[in-house]
């Protein structure tokens, strides 16, 4: 569970960021997230998972596949299809903004 100050950091990069829970799993919903150069589309909706999901300590899910990252996969979360890639070992003990930055590195 993220604290208010950590959510505020994420709101600086994605205004309207909020915490959402589904089935005991906590996500940070990022309504608009700018992606690194070369991704298409270059802005997407995202879910940042700050706890283990599918064998990864943290995950970043995107509303659209972006043509970057290795071993892409899709997952049904909150009744929608979300896309991610294999980018592991980003620890949950980082601040959420740091977790987000590390996941975005996987798309560069």
Spans of model-derived segments:
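Strand-helix-loop interaction patch of compact alpha/beta domains
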Residues: 1-41
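General structural signal for secondary-structure boundaries
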Residues: 3-4, 49, 95
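Amphipathic alpha-helical interface surfaces
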Residues: 6, 42, 56, 96-100
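Compact alpha/beta protein-protein interaction domains typified by the UBC
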Residues: 30-77
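Glycine-centered motif in EGF-like
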Residues: 61, 71-108
């Amino acid at each position: 569970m993220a604290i208010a100050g950590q959510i505020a950091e994420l709101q600086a990069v994605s205004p309207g960021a909020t915490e959402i829970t589904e089935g005991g799993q906590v996500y940070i919903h990022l309504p608009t997230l700018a992606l690194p150069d070369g991704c298409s589309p270059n802005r997407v909706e995202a879910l940042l998972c700050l706890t283990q999901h599918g064998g990864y300590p943290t995950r970043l899910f995107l509303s659209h596949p972006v043509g970057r990252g290795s071993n892409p996969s899709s997952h049904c979360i909150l009744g929608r299809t979300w896309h991610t890639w294999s980018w592991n070992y980003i620890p949950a003990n980082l601040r959420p903004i740091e977790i987000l930055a590390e996941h975005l590195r996987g798309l560069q």
